[in-house]
Design a protein with these regions (language model features):
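N-terminal hydrophobic/helix-forming segments and targeting peptides
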Residues: 1-179
């Protein structure tokens, strides 16, 4: 299982999108009985609505000096999950309300989502936040929110006994082993 975690660690996953489908394709290679299912964006499921599909190709914050303080390609936790696209330059003061950190865990990068409220943001360690200088910042989020689907999978593995054991997990939280 550690080998699986290492293979899947860097895949950019959310509750929808290509990273989730890539993860399930990898798991299907390990367990061929795995069967995918999908539900279209906008579908009402009990008290919940399946959100739009979200895919990202790039996201970063870069100070005018060239120093990057968040880079989705290095750690996809840096981007608030479901961030809307943006490509602009802004001041430190305008950027700060869009940054999230955990002062009580100064070396950790938080995991933040925004499935239903259109917004953008970045997550960084509190130590990095405190090192950010005043000045201008290039802010890029190359993402797309579109009609798509929520994809999941299930498998029935027949064992030696008649009892059933259910294993359930999520794969939507990227780069975390203990969430």
């Amino acid at each position: 299982m550690l080998e699986w975690a290492q293979a899947l660690f860097d895949l950019p996953r959310s509750i929808t999108g290509q990273g989730t489908r890539d993860t399930l394709a990898y798991l299907r290679e390990q367990e061929p009985s795995l069967e995918n299912w999908s539900v279209a964006s906008g579908t009402e499921v009990f008290d919940w609505t399946v959100p739009k599909e979200w895919n990202v190709t790039n996201a970063f914050i870069e100070h005018e000096s060239g120093t990057r303080y968040a880079d989705w390609k290095i750690n996809n936790l840096h981007l608030v999950n479901y961030s809307i696209p943006i490509d602009t330059t802004m001041s430190y003061e305008d950027l700060i309300p869009h940054l999230y950190s955990l002062p009580e865990q100064p070396d950790s990068i938080p995991y933040i989502t925004s499935y239903y409220q259109p917004r953008w943001g970045f997550c960084i360690s509190h130590n990095d936040l405190e090192q950010m200088p005043y000045g201008k910042y290039k802010v890029v989020i190359d993402s797309e929110l579109s009609g798509g689907e929520l994809t999941g999978a299930h498998a029935l593995v027949v064992g030696q006994f008649s009892e059933e054991i259910l294993f359930s997990t999520n794969i939507c939280h990227p780069m975390m082993a203990n969430n």
